[in-house]
Amino acid sequence: MKIYLLTLTFALTISVFSSESEMPNTNAQTMLLVHKTPTCGCCKKWIKHIEMSGLNTTTKNHESLEEIKATYNIKPEYRSCHTGVSEDGYIFEGHIPSQYINQFLSEDHPNAI
């Protein structure tokens, strides 16, 4: 009985540790640079939402975002009041919920533009 219990305990311990190491941990290291205007109130609320999900942000205020949008090739019909850029260069335009940003960043996207 003791051998069976020890084996079962060991197997469960291995299982727990292996599943923890396989889980993505994007929040701990992910930084988004958020380009916005200094007067936009909804951007501040979105940044708070993002930070509450565990993502880190750095904010850069601009009087106009036209040049930023052009730099990242964001077409006029897709432009919003702020642009978030991950360290890997992924662009998040507008009020994207944090759950989708976390999900996207935890997956591989070899063909993303």
Residue ranges and their predicted role:
Residues S18-S21, A28:
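Boundary at the C-terminal end of the N-terminal hydrophobic targeting segment
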